[in-house]
From Swiss-Prot:
This is Alpha-1B-glycoprotein. The lineage of its organism: Eukaryota, Metazoa, Chordata, Craniata, Vertebrata. Pfam families: ig (PF00047). The gene is A1BG. It is found in: Secreted. Gene3D superfamilies: Immunoglobulins. Plasma. Disulfide bonds join 49-96, 142-185, 235-282, 333-382, 431-478. It comes from Bos taurus (Bovine). One of its GO terms (biological process) is cell surface receptor signaling pathway. Keywords: Disulfide bond, Glycoprotein, Immunoglobulin domain, Repeat, Secreted, Signal. Residues 1-21 form the signal peptide.
């Protein structure tokens, strides 16, 4: 897929408390089916492909295989593909695409044409989050491939449909949610019609107060700072359109802020004093009279040291500084006395970064590196800082060079389906590694160019092949690449076979 065909995120920088809105442009087309008669939805079917940009070329994909493209005399935003009565030759899973800037754009949503009843299940999703709290308008979006239907919302445990919404000119309906529970939706083409298959179930929780945001120290600030330095902290909420607050202990920090997205804010701390390193949290509040502040984030810590105290001693266990991959390494930082905070610092191609901060009861901190790999290689040192005035800090310890040779741990790849995949469906493969902050790559056997890429800070990532057809059958593996200046590439995972039904 070309860069032009990728999703475009166009953000504007704001120095206000939070950016009011962001512009999101998705170049993918939309596809829907229209029935000639609601009483007989499969008797005369037309598929309509609508593009957000004008184009002269449309293409229908059936069961993962592209059909003959349609060339128009003049640019248009939509094209209609008449199927007529649904038969064995027209039954299938459809998507559409269009050509923009000489490249075919990523395919549309899936429309299932079965020719049978009950009608295919719709999809259901939550907006903006899957929980409710005072002051928040949570909704459920029910989406069908068939236009002009009546949508039905069901709450688990209720005998009747909870709500009914007609959508004569649309393929979706939005339902407000006021109760926690398990929801699904279906649709029908006329009042006496049989409801479609139900959608998957989504769970709505009631959370009061709202869940905590995340607070992180920006990379340039995640080092040992001198008093008088500046630092940046980023607070990210699980939804947009909220007011943020930075606190240290119970006291609000009225500092400059900026935002590039309505779900986050950057706090800028200037002229930091020696004792300004610990205890930062953030929270958010919906813009409603009923809204309460969220739970506090986990605390973020800065390390400020004036270098006036004696250097600590840093030692390793085992003493061998070329451990085997997968081993446990313990780095011990010892100060002349107790009552201090310790920071472990690593220097690599990306510079000096604080790895961890500990506040033990005694004069020694023990930093554990579990399952070490090549990404843990670097020059380690440590410092300590007084936790009481005047908050003096130490010189850095002597450096220990830790070198872990050998390949990175291999990732694991598994398919999120069983058996042969139905043509036209998406193939979702989950790649998982023990290393954080990596890009996962999906590769087909014998090919070097990745077919899908996904970034993950922690945990697995789902790699998706859209609208698979017989041409996608084969063997797949994944690998990952670490971020930063010292980029490392893992070995391939064990292979997973993708079988496509009928091929």
């Amino acid at each position: 897929m070309s860069a032009w065909a990728a999703l475009l995120l166009l953000w504007g920088l704001s120095l206000s408390p939070v950016t009011e809105q962001a512009t999101f442009f998705d170049p993918r087309p939309s596809l829907w089916a229209e029935a000639g008669s609601p009483l007989a939805p499969w008797a005369d079917v037309t598929l309509t492909c609508q593009s957000p940009l004008p184009t002269q070329e449309f293409q229908l994909l059936k069961d993962g295989v592209g059909q003959e493209p349609v060339h128009l005399e003049s640019p248009a935003h939509e094209h209609r593909f008449p199927l007529g009565p649904v038969t064995s030759t027209t039954r299938g899973l459809y998507r559409c695409s269009y050509k923009g800037n000489n490249d075919w754009i990523s395919p549309s949503n899936l429309v299932e044409v079965t020719g049978a009843e009950p009608l295919p299940a719709p999809s259901i999703s939550t907006s903006p989050v899957s929980w409710i709290t005072p002051g928040l308008n949570t909704t459920l979006l029910c989406l069908s491939g068939l236009r002009g239907v009546t949508f039905l919302l069901r709450l688990e445990g209720e005998d009747q449909f909870l709500e009914v919404a007609e959508a004569p000119e649309a393929t979706q309906a939005t339902f407000p949610v006021h109760r926690a529970g398990n929801y699904s939706c279906s649709y029908r083409t006329h009042a006496a019609g049989t409801p479609s298959e139900p959608s998957a179930t989504v769970t709505i929780e009631e959370l009061d107060p709202p869940p905590a945001p995340t607070l992180t120290v920006d990379r340039e600030s995640a080092k040992v700072l001198r008093p008088g330095s500046s630092a940046s902290l980023t607070c990210v909420a699980p939804l947009s359109g909220v007011d943020f607050q930075l606190r240290r202990g119970a006291e609000e920090q009225l500092v400059p802020r900026a935002s590039t997205s309505p779900d986050r804010v950057f706090f800028r701390l200037s002229a930091l004093a020696a004792g300004d390193g610990s205890g930062y949290t953030c929270r958010y509040r919906l813009r409603s009279e009923l809204a309460a502040w969220s739970r506090d984030s986990a605390p973020a810590e800065l390390v400020l040291s004036d270098g006036t105290l004696p250097a600590p001693e840093l030692s390793a266990e085992p003493a061998i500084l070329s451990p085997t991959p997968g081993a446990l390494v313990q780095l011990r930082c010892r100060a002349p006395r107790a009552g201090v905070r310790f920071a472990l610092v690593r220097k690599d191609a990306g510079g000096r970064q604080v790895q961890r901060v500990l506040s033990p009861a005694g004069p020694e901190a023990q930093f554990e590196l579990r399952g070490v790999s090549a990404v843990d290689s670097g020059n380690y040192s440590c410092v300590y800082v007084d936790t009481s005035p005047p908050f003096a800090g130490s010189k850095p310890s002597a450096t220990l060079e830790l070198r872990v040779d050998g390949p990175l741990p291999r990732p694991q790849l598994r398919a999120l389906w069983t058996g042969a995949l139905t043509p036209g469906r998406d193939a979702v493969l989950r790649c998982e590694a023990e290393v954080p902050d990596v890009s996962f790559l999906l590769l087909r056997a014998g090919e070097e160019e990745p077919l899908a890429v996904a970034w993950s800070t922690h945990g697995p990532a789902d790699l998706v092949l859209t609208s698979v057809g017989p041409q996608h059958a084969g063997t797949y593996s994944c690998r990952y690449r670490t971020g930063g200046p010292r980029s490392l590439l893992s070995e391939l995972s064990d292979p997973v076979e993708l079988r496509v039904a009928g091929s």
